[in-house]
Amino acid sequence: MPAAALQRRPWVPAASEDHVLSIAADAAARDAASVAVEIERLVAENHRIHDVDGLNLNPATNVMNPAAEALLSRGLGSRPSLGYPGDKYEMGLEAIERIEVVAAELAAEVFGAKFAEVRVSSGALSNLYVFMATCRPGDTIIVPPPSIGGHVTHHAAGAAGLYGLKPVSAPVDADGYTVDVAALAKLAGEVKPKLITIGGSLNLFPHPVPAIREIADGVGAKLLFDAAHLSGMVAGKAWPQPLEQGAHAITMSTYKSLGGPAGGLIVSNDAALMERIDAIAYPGLTANSDAGRTAALARSLLDWKVHGVAYAAAMRETAQALARALDARGLPVFVKARGFTQSHQLAVEAARWGGGQHAAKKIAQGGLLACGIGLPIAPVEGDINGLRLGVPEIVRLGFTPDDMPQLADWIARALEGDAASVAAEVRERRTHLGELRYIVR
């Protein structure tokens, strides 16, 4: 039996690497036809997990408009597209370059921007592009800490640190799940950042963007709004508009609340900043981009142009209804005194179940998919202290605020150890779902 080509990576946790090498050994032992069959089986299994047996309550994922998803397999992605529309390096790109412009125009319309960079392949790289356009290695930036959802890309282990920046965590307003403005002003005066970032992996209430912009101006810094999770809420006008409030740029993932293909997007009204970002994208780090993804993004943005206001409002109302229903079941939903949430996300204090990841694994046994998140409360040893929940996908599937007491009951019962019966009920509920909502057909 052939040995796997992959070798053990001593820097990877042993349990994970044992799992990897087991899969690799199985693949190495198969002939080509068997590997092809196995890939098809795994794709079908993923469909069962997400679309037959489960409900995604993870706000980092969504379901795409089938018309947009179909564009990913229409022969566009393997066609390199270097240069500006009207002057491409390769020939035969007359159609693809028009797709690129349509995607950028729709992004500008939806986000109220003058400029859009659609070639970025991920939200993390979108952040890196802005870091590179505003800072030099060795510069200091102020970023949201993990306790208020600050993403790793803003920190030392992520894009910021890998580029050589010195991230400093912003002071926290725990009750508002955002930054403490007065303390931020003091910190900015001390460390003189080149960039201040706001927005993260959990956003419950609007961030004080105008006040942060004033602080940034006072120290000569730029302001980046990371809308990786908030992109749909911003696009649907259910959230304050960051560019109008003073952000120099918005970065985002395009597959979370926005419900598009995997990738990134940058929008801005600052011409000088976007000129630098454009040069980073081409001929810098992006060069060729996936035109299939660009087409799928354009088709997804069209959904927001037509249905965005209704979809975003429905997400907010449904998230609030779920928070109230969980609270009524006795679950410790974070910041009850503030009304739980004004976004599509909410969080549960998870110490009772050993932490957020432990809680997520419990409800996953009931077909409810979620994950942990950091909260500005007492830590949980060996785990994250919060459970993050979101509603973008279930709202698109047709769930409404009226369904949230049932969903809260499933979550509570799964956490209490009744996952098997919950899983059966979730599977049955999925059989009654109709067509996707809030899409252009």
Swiss-Prot record:
Ranges that cross the membrane: none
Modified residues (N6-(pyridoxal phosphate)lysine): 256
Superkingdom of the organism of origin: Bacteria
Record EC number: 4.1.2.-
GO biological processes: glycine biosynthetic process from serine; tetrahydrofolate interconversion
Coiled-coil segments on the chain, per record: none
GO MF annotations, alphabetized: glycine hydroxymethyltransferase activity; lyase activity; pyridoxal phosphate binding
Reactions it catalyzes: 2-methyl-L-serine = formaldehyde + L-alanine
GO cellular component: cytoplasm
Subunit organization: Homodimer.
Family (UniProt): Belongs to the SHMT family. Alpha-methylserine aldolase subfamily.
Protein name in the entry: Alpha-methylserine aldolase
Organism, as annotated: Variovorax paradoxus
Upper taxonomic lineage: Bacteria, Pseudomonadati, Pseudomonadota, Betaproteobacteria, Burkholderiales
